[in-house]
């Protein structure tokens, strides 16, 4: 969950089987549910499966979005940034080993939440729709040392 709205992760870390509703404050709007209807079941399923759960800051959400874009070419929305951010956190904590097979479901695209990453990556720019313009722009990015 995003730290600005993490009632389930907070309860899990505290070892509780119930959560306290919160007022959401996060860039991950699609996950900003302060009183999740299935929160109890999420806690129960995580405990029964000996799973793990955590929360990430909005900055870590943006870093997750950037990491996925740079490594896989996927522009995820903020919920996907939460998924990747928490995945990275669980790896750092040793709860997921670097060689473990792990699947991260990223179902929303970043076009829905562009405003969340504008400060970190800059505003998108437009080119005229042609292969020549694309190739020229792509080459400029490579020559400037930018990621293309």
Regions found by a protein language model. Name each.
Residues 28, 32, 71, 78, ...:
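Short glycine/serine/threonine-biased micro-segments
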Residues 2, 6, 21, 25, ...:
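Electropositive phosphate-/nucleotide-binding environments in soluble metabolic enzymes
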Residues 16-20, 50, 72-75, 122-125:
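Short, low-complexity, polar/charged sequence segments that are solvent-exposed and flexible
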Residues 20-25, 84-148:
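Phosphate-binding loop/pocket of nucleotide- and phosphate-handling active sites
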Residues 37-97:
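Active-site-adjacent helical/loop segments in soluble small-molecule enzymes
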Residues 2, 6, 25, 47-50, ...:
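A generic, residue-level signal for flexible/boundary positions that often mark functional hotspots
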Residues 1-48, 112-113, 117:
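Glycine-rich phosphate/pyrophosphate-binding loop at beta-loop-alpha junctions
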């Amino acid at each position: 969950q995003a730290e600005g709205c993490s009632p389930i992760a907070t309860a899990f870390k505290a070892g509780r089987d119930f959560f306290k509703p919160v007022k959401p404050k996060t860039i991950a709007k699609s996950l900003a549910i302060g009183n999740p209807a299935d929160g109890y079941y999420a806690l129960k399923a995580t405990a029964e499966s000996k799973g793990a759960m955590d929360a990430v800051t909005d900055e870590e959400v943006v870093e997750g979005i950037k990491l996925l874009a740079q490594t896989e070419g996927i522009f995820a929305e903020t919920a996907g940034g939460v998924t990747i951010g928490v995945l990275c956190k669980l790896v750092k904590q040793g709860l997921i080993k670097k060689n473990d097979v792990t699947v991260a479901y990223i179902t929303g695209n970043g076009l829905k939440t562009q405003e969340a990453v504008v400060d970190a990556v800059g505003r998108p720019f437009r080119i005229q729709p042609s292969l020549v313009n694309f190739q020229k722009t792509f080459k400029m990015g490579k020559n400037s040392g930018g990621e293309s």
